[in-house]
């Protein structure tokens, strides 16, 4: 009879990480045989919810898949990769985290290794669960019109984002399942994988970890606050997966990413997430690969041109399908809103079906000019062509005016000046708050922004797009 640990974990084959482990729910007898606590939920139960399966129907690269034909991967596979990466970081950081907690909270029992690892894994799995069709484009074109839920931990006036929706889904839709988890996958040792008696993951911890911008909440356990930069820091378990995954599926050679070296030189100190100075080269190498992906894939000229067409039709199209309300106020209906639903309807509009002069919210119909643009998009006939480009690097403030000026002025309906900016490395003001650096032999390390000085703080790709004649 095979060891009980084989019954406790499924293996998922993945081109980036090799094998991704996923906990399976064990019957009471099997739990006892494996020396694990009784459980009535496991990661497979979360994976099989409608919210997670919906991510199969949301593409990872939105409009870029019309430019890179093999980039057909989804937010679902990315979420699995982030979960796996987060678990690796949890295992690596746990010994130093327990030691730092003992120094800062003497006499307090540290959380079990299983609880720490599984909390990070669930945060990684669910960090994108709030995404809508076309992912970040949905944020910009639809969600930005609505206010975020009120949260006393941040200033008011914030626009709604997919991270806000992820927090709502985690706490209100998936919270009961999350609370019932009792172990992380691993080598089958109960002392490492199982939660301690009385421990459970608080969904509020997971919601806190996935929040952006980062929340200031002293009431959160110290160890949760220390781990927050892994999901919103200089490097994250999110971008450590998507840079490699997107490069693989687009066929782009982004350069080496040595995630293991980065992990091996990371630890938790009383300052929080800390990188030993010899790991800086691996960090710089990774940030360089990330910048390359923005320049070659995410900000590709044809991708940006397609986005200009999408920007014209996206809001009225979602309005036709979903109505005028905020997704935050109707999560039940939002669960049914994915790219399959949108593109199925867009194909009907492109054929001239459900097209009227005065559509009403939620009636599934759109105006003729919107239908015409969708027809061009679905046939991959962008109506905009880049005729000039400028690239610039800068440290603070808006993009350099002299560089932008070379593109000339826009003309409504004929010329669009498109400015795409990526933060290539953290600014000097943010860097040390996100990641501490420990010098060799106890010596002070260079400030992080200085150590990464070969990378710009911001990189601009500006383009002048002109309307294609007859489009």
Regions found by a protein language model. Give the residues of each.
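Histidine-centered, transition-metal-coordinating active-site segments
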Residues: 1-122, 132-471
């Amino acid at each position: 009879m095979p060891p009980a640990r084989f019954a406790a974990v499924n293996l998922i084959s993945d081109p980036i990480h090799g094998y991704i482990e996923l906990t399976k729910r064990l019957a009471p007898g099997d739990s006892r045989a494996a020396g694990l606590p009784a459980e009535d939920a496991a990661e497979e139960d979360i994976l099989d919810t409608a919210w997670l399966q919906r991510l199969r129907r949301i593409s990872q690269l939105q409009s870029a898949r019309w430019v890179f034909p093999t980039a057909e991967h989804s937010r679902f596979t990315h979420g699995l990769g982030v979960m796996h990466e987060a678990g690796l970081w949890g295992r690596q950081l746990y010994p130093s985290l327990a030691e730092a907690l003992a120094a800062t909270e003497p006499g307090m029992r540290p959380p079990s290794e299983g609880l720490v690892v599984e909390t990070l894994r669930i945060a990684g799995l669910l960090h994108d669960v709030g995404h809508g069709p076309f992912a970040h484009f949905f944020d910009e074109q639809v969600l930005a019109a609505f206010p975020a839920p009120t949260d006393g931990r941040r200033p008011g006036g914030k626009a709604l984002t997919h991270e806000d929706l992820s927090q709502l889904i985690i706490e209100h839709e998936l919270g009961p399942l999350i609370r019932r988890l009792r172990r992380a996958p691993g080598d089958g040792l109960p002392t490492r994988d199982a939660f301690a008696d009385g421990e459970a993951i608080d969904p509020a911890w997971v919601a806190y970890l996935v929040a952006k911008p980062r929340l200031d909440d002293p009431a959160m356990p110290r160890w949760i606050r220390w781990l927050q930069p892994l999901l919103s820091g200089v490097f994250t378990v999110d971008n450590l997966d998507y840079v490699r995954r997107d490069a693989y599926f687009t066929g782009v050679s982004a350069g080496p990413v040595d995630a293991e070296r980065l992990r091996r030189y990371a630890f938790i100190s009383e300052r929080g997430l800390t990188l030993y100075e010899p790991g800086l080269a691996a960090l710089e190498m990774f940030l360089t690969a990330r910048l390359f992906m923005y320049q070659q894939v995410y900000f590709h000229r044809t991708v940006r041109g397609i986005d200009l067409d999408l920007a014209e039709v996206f809001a009225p199209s979602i309005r036709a399908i979903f109505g005028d309300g905020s997704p935050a106020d109707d999560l039940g209906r939002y669960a049914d809103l994915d790219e399959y639903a949108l593109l199925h309807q867009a194909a009907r509009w492109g054929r001239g079906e459900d097209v009227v002069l005065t559509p009403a919210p939620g009636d599934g119909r759109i105006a003729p000019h919107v239908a015409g643009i969708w027809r061009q998009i679905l046939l991959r006939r962008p109506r905009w062509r880049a005729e000039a480009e400028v690239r610039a690097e800068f440290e603070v403030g808006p993009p350099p005016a002299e560089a932008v000026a070379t593109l000339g002025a826009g003309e409504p309906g004929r010329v669009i000046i498109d400015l795409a900016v990526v933060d290539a490395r953290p600014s000097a003001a943010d860097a040390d708050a996100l990641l501490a650096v420990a010098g060799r032999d106890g010596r002070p390390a260079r400030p992080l922004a200085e150590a990464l000085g070969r990378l710009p703080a911001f990189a601009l790709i500006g383009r002048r797009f002109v309307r294609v004649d007859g489009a």
